[in-house]
Amino acid sequence: MSSDEWSAAEDEGQLSRLLRKSRDSPFVPVGMAGFVAVLSYGLYKLNSRREQKMSLHLIHVRVAAQGCVVGAVTLGVLYSMYKDYIRPRFFNVPKK
């Protein structure tokens, strides 16, 4: 069988794919956890929003959750740039 043909044995499950991607870029689970934490806190505080409209409260929660994810992506990109370009140049570490 040629190497470009699909095989069911080579198909990985969702959990193994998530674990592999977590090893490749460790800030993905951080962003996901931050998103879930901010969203959970926002839904928890839904009853104590006082005079604020529900739609405005949900927009604020969404923006905070997206900010958490964007921050994690930014940190991941900075870490990747450091690992690929800065560390090998100054510390003579070979690339993987």
UniProtKB/Swiss-Prot annotation:
GO annotation, cellular component aspect: membrane
TM helices/strands, residue ranges: 27-44, 59-81
Location of the HIG1 domain: 1-91
Gene3D superfamilies: 6.10.140.1320
Name of one Pfam family that matches: HIG_1_N
Location within or outside the cell: Membrane
Keyword Cytoplasm included in the entry's annotation: no
Principal subcellular localization: membrane
Gene Ontology biological-process annotations: response to hypoxia
The name this protein goes by in its record: HIG1 domain family member 1C
Organism: Mus musculus (Mouse)
